[in-house]
Amino acid sequence: MKSIYITGYMGAGKTTIGKALSKELHMDVVDTDQKIEEKQGKVIRDIFAEEGEMAFREYESEMLCSLPVDNVIITTGGGIVEREENRKWMKENGTVVYLYCDPHVIAERLREDTTRPLFQKKDIDAFVTKFESRRAYYEEAHIHIDTTNKSVKQIMNELKEKINE
């Protein structure tokens, strides 16, 4: 089976659904952000602060292309879709899943999360604007799942059905 790439905005459920899908399909799951942190020896927040977003996006593209393209679930960072080369790579090397969640619901989920470098608690409008700027890229995915106010079980049932179509 080709790789399954899980995309979506921060807080949409990529990591949670990736882990659940991994158990269900008996496939390994790899998180691009975690792999970048391991390779760079620092957390993403520090990469953004010390090297900037452009450096992080370069690490992200390099990491994406270094991962297996068969029998693995890859959970991605929310901004991986910003680079056309990344979108092309994922579409050519696997099935791309877009987890959509209403950005206002995400903002509520992330209100107290200090590990998200692009989430500004005080500026929900900027958060929604960033989401909307990426939306067309996310929608290039093969499979779309709306996770808004759904349980993991509901999302998994819908995702399994669409993967098997």
Swiss-Prot record:
Q: In its keyword annotation, does this UniProt entry include Cell cycle?
A: no
Q: Principal place where this protein is found?
A: cytoplasm
Family, according to the entry, reads as follows: Belongs to the shikimate kinase family.
The processes (GO biological process) annotated in the record are: amino acid biosynthetic process; aromatic amino acid family biosynthetic process; chorismate biosynthetic process
Q: Where does substrate bind?
A: D33, R57, G78, R134
Q: Name one GO cellular component term.
A: cytosol
Assembly notes: Monomer.
What role does it play?
Catalyzes the specific phosphorylation of the 3-hydroxyl group of shikimic acid using ATP as a cosubstrate.
UniProt-annotated location(s): Cytoplasm
Q: Among its keywords, does the record have Cytoplasm?
A: yes
Reaction it catalyzes: shikimate + ATP = 3-phosphoshikimate + ADP + H(+)
Q: Which InterPro entries match?
A: P-loop_NTPase (IPR027417), Shikimate/glucono_kinase (IPR031322), Shikimate_kinase/TSH1 (IPR000623)
In its UniProt record, a GO molecular function of this protein is:
shikimate kinase activity
Organism annotation: Bacillus anthracis (strain CDC 684 / NRRL 3495)
Note the Pfam families from the entry.
SKI
State the EC number(s). Answer: 2.7.1.71
Q: What top-level branch of life does the organism fall under?
A: Bacteria
**EC class:** transferase
Q: Which SUPFAM superfamilies match?
A: P-loop containing nucleoside triphosphate hydrolases
Q: Where does Mg(2+) bind?
A: T15
What's the protein name? Shikimate kinase
